[in-house]
Amino acid sequence: MIFDDVLDLAKKVSKYTIAGEGNVSIRDGDTMLIKASGSTLETMTDEDLVRCNLDGNALDDEKKKPSMEVSFHAWILKSFPEIKCVCHTHPTNTNKILCSGDIIDFANKRLFPDQVVRNGIMSCVVPYA
């Protein structure tokens, strides 16, 4: 069942993230379940999921709120009906690069041919405040 697979995926990818950060969402018919704000990928269970419509609005009258990135997940699931789940993380090694003085050089390199196709010939870097 995709639901159990997504929870398993969340736990596995959490090992490569800062403090279990990131989000997962699962399509469920015309709605989605997304990780609740304040929950971690490492420890999440079905109790840490909030039901939302595909516009990103919470449907359950619960104390838990959906992740602040609910709009991003909702947009993907609404725009691409073939997608059943979305998982994104904040990987430790990627964050090391993003916080280093080498980010501009790294961002302007293209390591794989499909990066040019998907990302174009230039990168946009927004420095951390």
Label the model's feature ranges:
Residues 1-129:
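Glycine-rich flexible loops
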